[in-house]
Amino acid sequence: MTEITAEGNASTTTTVIDSKNGSVPKSPGKVLKRTVTEDIVTTFSSPAAWLLVIALIITWSAVAIVMFDLVDYKNFSASSIAKIGSDPLKLVRDAMEETTDWIYGFFSLLSDIISSEDEEDDDGDEDTDKGEIDEPPLRKKEIHKDKTEKQEKPERKIQTKVTHKEKEKGKEKVREKEKPEKKATHKEKIEKKEKPETKTLAKEQKKAKTAEKSEEKTKKEVKGGKQEKVKQTAAKVKEVQKTPSKPKEKEDKEKAAVSKHEQKDQYAFCRYMIDIFVHGDLKPGQSPAIPPPLPTEQASRPTPASPALEEKEGEKKKAEKKVTSETKKKEKEDIKKKSEKETAIDVEKKEPGKASETKQGTVKIAAQAAAKKDEKKEDSKKTKKPAEVEQPKGKKQEKKEKHVEPAKSPKKEHSVPSDKQVKAKTERAKEEIGAVSIKKAVPGKKEEKTTKTVEQEIRKEKSGKTSSILKDKEPIKGKEEKVPASLKEKEPETKKDEKMSKAGKEVKPKPPQLQGKKEEKPEPQIKKEAKPAISEKVQIHKQDIVKPEKTVSHGKPEEKVLKQVKAVTIEKTAKPKPTKKAEHREREPPSIKTDKPKPTPKGTSEVTESGKKKTEISEKESKEKADMKHLREEKVSTRKESLQLHNVTKAEKPARVSKDVEDVPASKKAKEGTEDVSPTKQKSPISFFQCVYLDGYNGYGFQFPFTPADRPGESSGQANSPGQKQQGQ
């Protein structure tokens, strides 16, 4: 059957082609004549066409008079003035006669043309066209001549009919006459066929060129994005850590030089684009070819706490960059892929905490397309960095050094009990605000991948930290007093980390010291892993549900902190809608905050730290499992409780603020002021971070590069976001 259908189709197509070829000699000549006459008749049958013709005649006649000086204006004007002065009525009558004669002739000619259009041929139409052009000067005499010519035209038509009869009798003569017409039609058809072919070829060439240009642009953007990321990280390093910034700047310059040499070798015409990228016109997240760097690098790579460690890492990076520069010269094609991975690794090594900010732009663009590439990169990066993963002790030491920064507030809190509560609550409020917003931004896809690794790392790190943190806290006080400025610069980063960590550890009702110490621990985890935050976020939602009543009592000094944070966010983002979202996000945490201050005893906290931390680990595991079941049921209750909290907090904020101000001494107020003002001083990193919170997130996609631990985190983050939208509305 298939063969028969194919043959039938082929036969039909061939017959159609044959019929066309056979009909070409007979019909096309006639068809062309008919189409020409019909076109002329249809066009000139409408009065608009004649109006256009008249307008053209008048305009071009005026142009000719002016261009060639056909009129003697002086004599004409003088004679006309003299005539008007002598006999004005004669001039008017003469003008009226001329115009009436011209108009009469014009309309009579129109009537003749319209009446005789059906009988006319191309020749007759040409004669009428000539008559039309000559009408105005010749007037009535030409009209009579046109009528006589029109009488001759039907005779010519009769002759043409005779020729058709002769064609039927003598086909050879007619074929000889019509052969040129056939050839013309065939040529036209061939040309028409060739034109689309040329168009298709041109389109293919254009597509190829555009594809090449797009590839080149992506390469440029990749390289330019590398340079910009390097520069941004260098600027951030200068703000936070002044000593290690010099080797990093040298590395940045080396990178820029390597990329420029490559581009000069490969693309000479790209230098202009490179200059644009160097000057920073391209935004960090615009290079589509760069997939978002993975937070697994953070887990495997500890953030440098001291300048000595950072300098060592900088030397390692330099060695890696030298190797990469040599390989780039040898293999230009392979480097385009490798350089993306290596640059992403280097940028995250320099500041994984801040690289996450730059990642936020890229995550939105290439999140979906790069998910598969991220998995491959995770495998390659894990193989490259087994030594770093095998050294948890070194990480713990660095983490201890980083715990020093958040340890300030809890230890100074021991001196004045009321101040302790105020400062702990302020820090917790800020940290929890970030935690709530980060919950919403958690990507759902990466949660599945990293749950197992996060739990194992959390257990190892916490077991090592329990014994070491108590020893570190005493020398920490002296160090913090010596270096307040540098720590204040680092506070924005530590606050972000504390937001992630405290959100998770608020689940355990324990004294604020323990919570402060616990806050110290998870900061490196969040920078390195960014994963425990999500499992902890799930616990935060439970806290919101379990402890609504205490939120009213304890969350009141914390609400003061919320106001300060709101003011900072509103100043940085002049957008009304995002601020509303931020306010709702900041108002929800009071339910979370109450979990911490329940146990106030602080002398016994140190004794029970080791036992409680072990129980906390077991509690987290059990809660993470239970979260999967309870989150859906508790979503509705959390929203209602948050609405109640808004009403309570609005009434109680002013009174609480005055009480807290009285309790806090001047020195600690100044420190809190520095904590609040520090984000304004370092506008570039923090404003970008907060803008992503407020602007970009709709509750449907993931904002941040942090890999979540569990699906419950994803479901909870998405559940809260619509609830907060309802509150905002």
UniProtKB/Swiss-Prot annotation:
Q: Where, by residue number, does the polypeptide cross the bilayer? A: 48-68
Transmembrane among the record's keywords? yes
Q: What does the PTM comment state? A: Phosphorylated by CaMK2. N-glycosylated.
- Name one matching Pfam family: Asp-B-Hydro_N
**Effect on the protein upon substituting T59R:** In CARDAR; results in intracellular retention and degradation of the mutant protein
List of glycosylated residues: N75, N647
Q: Which gene encodes it?
A: TRDN
Residue spans, topological domain Lumenal: 69-729
Protein task? Contributes to the regulation of lumenal Ca2+ release via the sarcoplasmic reticulum calcium release channels RYR1 and RYR2, a key step in triggering skeletal and heart muscle contraction. Required for normal organization of the triad junction, where T-tubules and the sarcoplasmic reticulum terminal cisternae are in close contact. Required for normal skeletal muscle strength. Plays a role in excitation-contraction coupling in the heart and in regulating the rate of heart beats.
Write out the annotated subcellular location. Answer: Cell membrane; Sarcoplasmic reticulum membrane
UniProt disease link:
Cardiac arrhythmia syndrome, with or without skeletal muscle weakness: An autosomal recessive cardiac disorder characterized by stress-induced arrhythmias in infancy or early childhood. Patients present with recurrent syncope or cardiac arrest after physical activity or emotional stress. Sudden death may occur in early childhood. Some patients have muscle weakness.
Q: Which ranges does the record list as Cytoplasmic topological domains?
A: 1-47
What this protein is called in its record is Triadin
Name the UniProt key words of this record, in alphabetical order: Cell membrane, Disease variant, Disulfide bond, Glycoprotein, Membrane, Phosphoprotein, Sarcoplasmic reticulum, Transmembrane, Transmembrane helix
| Compositional bias annotation for Polar residues | 8-24, 715-729
Q: How does it assemble?
A: Homooligomer of variable subunit number; disulfide-linked. Interacts with CASQ1 and RYR1 in skeletal muscle. Interacts with CASQ2.
